[in-house]
UniProtKB/Swiss-Prot annotation:
This is Glutamate--tRNA ligase. InterPro entries: aa-tRNA-synth_I_cd-bd (IPR045462), aa-tRNA-synth_I_codon-bd_sub2 (IPR020751), aa-tRNA-synth_I_CS (IPR001412), aa_tRNA-synth_I_cd-bd_sf (IPR008925), Glu-tRNA-ligase_bac/mito (IPR004527), Glu/Gln-tRNA-synth (IPR000924), Glu/Gln-tRNA-synth_Ib_cat-dom (IPR020058), GluQ/Sye (IPR049940). The gene is gltX. ATP binds at K264. It comes from Psychrobacter cryohalolentis (strain ATCC BAA-1226 / DSM 17306 / VKM B-2378 / K5). Its EC number is 6.1.1.17. It comes from the Bacteria. It is an enzyme of class 6 (ligase).
C-alpha cells in the first residue's frame, strides 16, 4: 500500500481547506482549525479555501451557512475560493456536486472496491444489538459484500433501496502517516465497511471529502484528531482511485477546563456568542492561535500576520488545549487596553451599531418610553453578556425551583435544534412545551423574563430572544439553569428521556 508523504517541501503547491457543515451555530472549533489551515498555507506561500459540507440535507440550512461564513470573516479569516466568492473548482457546496460523487462511487463498484448493500435499518439495528450482546464492537458484518452480480442487478432493477459501501481488508494493520504523530498503526479489524453513498444518492463525509480534496488539489488535510481513526478509510480510497494522498495532520481537540471535549453544555462554543458578548475579533483569533501552540518568542499577544510570519506546525502540542473563558477575557482586556481612546470608541460603536438589531430594539421599546433617556433602562439587557441574577430571582408563586429548572432545560434543548431562529418558531416551541407540561403560558414564561432580561419588567421576551439571537439566548438559559443549582447526572438522564419523547411542536403549527 502506498504511503503518503509527511513533507511540506513538496513540488506540489500548498493548498489547505476548511469544510464546515451548515447544521448549527459557527463553532469556535471551526475557527481554530481554519486558523491553523490558513496559517500553514500562507506560511508556505500557498492558498486556503473553504467549501461547505451540506450532504446532511435534513439538518443543513442556508441560515447556518451564512452565519458560519459571516463569523469566520468577522474573526479575521479569508479564503481564496469558496461558495460565496467562487473559484476554479466550483461548485463549493457538496449538495451541488452529487453527480460527481455518484460517478466516483460507481467507479469503485466497477473495480470491485465497493459493493451495494441492501440491508434495512431494522436489519442493521439487529446486527449491532447482537454484536453488542456478544461483547463485540458494532460494525457491518459484510453480509451483502459477496452477493452474486445477478442478485445485485435483480434487486437494483426491483428498486430496492440500497447504499454503496467500500470494501476494507479483514486482517493486517494500516499505517497512517501524520505530521504531528509520525506513523500511526490502526488494525483493519477496527475499520468498518463505510457507507460511501446513501440511499438518497448523497455521499457521506468519507467519499465526498476524498473526492473533493483530490479534485480541488488539496495538498495538506489539517483536521481535528477525532478523524484519525477514519484515516485508514480515506487512505484506502486514495489507493483505490490511484490518486496522490494529501499530507495528514490531526490537530488536538479543544477542551473544557475539566479536560472534557469542548461542549456547549459547559462553555459557550459559538463564535457569534463571543462577538455579541464584546470580544474583539483580534483577541479571539489570538486566543485560538494559542490553543496548543506557542510562538518562538513565547509571546502571548500576537496578530495573525505575526503568527503566519513565524509559523511552524511542529510547535503544535498534542496535549488537549484548554479553552478557558476567563483567560480569553483577560487576553481581550489586554487588547482593549492597548487601544487609544479613539480606537476604543470606534470599537464600541462598531460592536453596538448593528443597524438591524438597533431597529428591532427601537421597535420593541418605542411603546414604553417617554424620553430618549428612558431607552437606556429598557434596552440595556439587549447588550449585556449575562444578567445579574441569583436563585431568588426566580421565586414564583406557582412553580417550584425544580419545575423552573426542568422547563428551562427542556426549552433549551428544544430551542437548540430550531431549523431557523425566528420569533414565530420560538413562540410555537415554547407554547407547545407549556401546553405539553400543562403549565399556563403566563406562568411558563415568567422565568424566561428573568433568564433573558434579568427582570420581569421588560419588552416581550420572545421578541427579545429573537433580537439577541440564538447564541446569546441559549447561553443565558444555560446560565439560568446553573444559577438554579444545575442538573445532576441522575436528573439529567431523566430529563433527556423526557425530552426524547416530546413531539415536534413546529409540526403541530
Amino acid at each position: 500500500m502506498m504511503q503518503p508523504s509527511t513533507s511540506t517541501n513538496s513540488i506540489r503547491p500548498v493548498r489547505t481547506r476548511i469544510a464546515p457543515s451548515p447544521t448549527g451555530f459557527p463553532h469556535v472549533g471551526t475557527a481554530y482549525i481554519a486558523l491553523f489551515n490558513l496559517a500553514f498555507a500562507k506560511a508556505h506561500g500557498g492558498e486556503f479555501i473553504l467549501r461547505i459540507e451540506d450532504t446532511d440535507q435534513t439538518r443543513s440550512t442556508e441560515q447556518s451557512e451564512k452565519m458560519i461564513l459571516d463569523a469566520l470573516r468577522w474573526v479575521g479569516l479569508d479564503w481564496a475560493e469558496g461558495p460565496d466568492i467562487g473559484g476554479p473548482h466550483a461548485p463549493y457546496r457538496q449538495s451541488e456536486r452529487s453527480d460527481i460523487y455518484k460517478k466516483h462511487a460507481e467507479q469503485l463498484i466497477e473495480n470491485d472496491h465497493a459493493f451495494r448493500c441492501f440491508c434495512s435499518s431494522e436489519e442493521l439495528d439487529a446486527m449491532r444489538a447482537e454484536q453488542m450482546a456478544n461483547g463485540e464492537t458494532p460494525r457491518y458484518d459484510g453480509r451483502c459484500a459477496h452477493l452474486a452480480a445477478e442478485k445485485t442487478e435483480q434487486l437494483v432493477a426491483e428498486g430496492k433501496p440500497h447504499v454503496i459501501r467500500m470494501r476494507v481488508p479483514t486482517e493486517g494493520v494500516c499505517q497512517v502517516q501524520d505530521m504531528l504523530r509520525g506513523t500511526v498503526e490502526i488494525p483493519w479489524t477496527q475499520v468498518d465497511m463505510q457507507v460511501l453513498l446513501k440511499t438518497d444518492g448523497m455521499p457521506t463525509y468519507h467519499l465526498a471529502n476524498v473526492v473533493d480534496d483530490h479534485l480541488m488539489d488539496i495538498s495538506h488535510v489539517m483536521r481535528g484528531e477525532e478523524w484519525l481513526n477514519s484515516a485508514p478509510k480515506h487512505q484506502l480510497l486514495y489507493e483505490y482511485f490511484g490518486w496522490e494522498m494529501p499530507v495528514l495532520c490531526h490537530m488536538p481537540l479543544l477542551r473544557n477546563p475539566d479536560k472534557s471535549k469542548l461542549s456547549k453544555r459547559k462553555n459557550p462554543t459559538s463564535i457569534t456568542y463571543y462577538r455579541d458578548a464584546g470580544v474583539l475579533p483580534e483577541a479571539l483569533l489570538n486566543y485560538l492561535g494559542r490553543m496548543g501552540y506557542s510562538m518562538p518568542d513565547e509571546a502571548e499577544q500576537f496578530t495573525l500576520e505575526e503568527m503566519i510570519a513565524s509559523f511552524d506546525i511542529q510547535r503544535v502540542s498534542l496535549g488537549g488545549p484548554i479553552f478557558d473563558i476567563e483567560k480569553l477575557n483577560w487576553l481581550n482586556s489586554e487588547w482593549l487596553r492597548a487601544l487609544t481612546p479613539e480606537e476604543l470608541k470606534n470599537k464600541i460603536l462598531e460592536w453596538a451599531s448593528n443597524s438591524d438589531k438597533l431597529t428591532a430594539i427601537a421597535a420593541a421599546i418605542q411603546p414604553r418610553i417617554e424620553l430618549l433617556s428612558d431607552a437606556v433602562n429598557w434596552s440595556g439587557f439587549y447588550f449585556q453578556n449575562l444578567p445579574d441574577i441569583n436563585a431568588e430571582s426566580f421565586t414564583h408563586k406557582s412553580l417550584t425551583p425544580e419545575q423552573i429548572m426542568d422547563m428551562l432545560q427542556l426549552s433549551l434543548w428544544q430551542l437548540e435544534v430550531l431549523p431557523t431562529w425566528s420569533e414565530e418558531n420560538i413562540y410555537a416551541t415554547l407554547k407547545g412545551l407549556a401546553a405539553h407540561l400543562d403549565i399556563k403560558m403566563r406562568d411558563f414564561m415568567a422565568p424566561f423574563f428573568i433568564a433573558i432580561a434579568g427582570s420581569t419588567s421588560s419588552t416581550p421576551v420572545m421578541n427579545s430572544m429573537a433580537i439577541i439571537g440564538a447564541d446569546m439566548t441559549l447561553t443565558r438559559l444555560r446560565h439560568a439553569v446553573d444559577v438554579l443549582g444545575g442538573l445532576g447526572k441522575k436528573k439529567l438522564k431523566k430529563l433527556e428521556k423526557q425530552a426524547a419523547e416530546l413531539p415536534d411542536f413546529l409540526a403541530a403549527e
